[in-house]
Structures are given as C-alpha cells and as structure tokens.
Amino acid sequence: MPLLDSFKVDHTRMNAPAVRVAKTMTTPKGDTITVFDLRFVRPNIEILSPRGIHTMEHLFAGFMRDHLNSDTVEIIDISPMGCRTGFYMSLIGSPSAEEVAKAWEASMRDALEKVPDETKIPELNEFQCGSYKEHSLADAHEIVRNVLKQPIGINRNKDLALDEKLLNP
C-alpha cells in the first residue's frame, strides 16, 4: 500500500492552531486542487470531542466558504480528520496559507457571534445530518475560543518532514 502524504510529516512537531498545505495537484484540464491541513490542536496531546468536532463541521463548512470562496477559489469539501485534531479542506485554486488562516479566524468569530444557540446550527435535523443528535454547541464554542486564544500559524512541510528511519517499511 502506498504511503500517504499525511503520514510523511512528523506529527510531534506540528503546531496548532496552524494551516499546512498538505497537497497540491493539477487536474487533466489544468485546474489546481489544493488540500489544506487545518490543525486545531496538537496531535497526540489534545483531541476534539466527537460532539464538538461534529458541530464544528456544520459551522466551519459554511463560514469558511463565506470568507474564502472567490473568483479564483472554490472550496470542494471540509472534513474532520479521523484523529480528531483538525480538518482537511480541499479546494479548487491555490490561496496562500496566510489567506486561509485569515479566513479561518474570521469563520471562528462567525461561529461565536452568529450561532448563539443550538437552534442556529445549520442542517441540524434528521433529514440533512446522519447523526443529528450527536452535537454540542458548547463544545464547538470551546474549540473556537481555544483557536482564537493565539494567532493561527503556518506549518510547513519542509519543517515537518519525517526522518525516513521512522517510516514504516
């Protein structure tokens, strides 16, 4: 099985909150697709609660689009990481990590200011959500407040390259 790019970076050296360009590819038609690692907490040190990350998924998806989509950028998907330390965001275009960090910060402010109670969580019903009872706005707001406590940084692949001796054969 091929070694995926996300397993070629040293998770013990990742900072959070931080943006990392996880992958860039060009489609056969010439479009650029960029995948960003949006790391909310430090791997193996902290973890986002299941209910909190699920609620963040609902909030983050819309607010990031509000702040990042443009004539040259269109978000395809924002999905929680299985390790529950952040989200992957795939998009058409190639915004800078700094632009993504700015949009991320603005979307976090929106999550606090525009969603004061659970009735305001988008798509929170059995028809649009596969686990609509698995939410916590309190946990999501705690995640947001923790992100906003410090500037959102940039994790660079060259700084996180995993020593080949540590890679599983």
UniProtKB/Swiss-Prot annotation:
UniProt-recorded Gene Ontology molecular function terms: iron ion binding; S-ribosylhomocysteine lyase activity
One Pfam short name: LuxS
SUPFAM superfamilies with a match to the protein in the record: LuxS/MPP-like metallohydrolase
Cofactor(s) needed by this chain: Fe cation
Broad class of enzyme this protein falls into: lyase
EC number: 4.4.1.21
Domain of life: Bacteria
Catalytic activity: S-(5-deoxy-D-ribos-5-yl)-L-homocysteine = (S)-4,5-dihydroxypentane-2,3-dione + L-homocysteine
Free-text comment on the cofactor: Binds 1 Fe cation per subunit.
Keywords tagged on the record: Autoinducer synthesis, Iron, Lyase, Metal-binding, Quorum sensing
Subunit structure: Homodimer.
Family, as annotated: Belongs to the LuxS family.
HAMAP family registered for this protein in UniProt: LuxS
Function: Involved in the synthesis of autoinducer 2 (AI-2) which is secreted by bacteria and is used to communicate both the cell density and the metabolic potential of the environment. The regulation of gene expression in response to changes in cell density is called quorum sensing. Catalyzes the transformation of S-ribosylhomocysteine (RHC) to homocysteine (HC) and 4,5-dihydroxy-2,3-pentadione (DPD).
Protein name in the entry: S-ribosylhomocysteine lyase
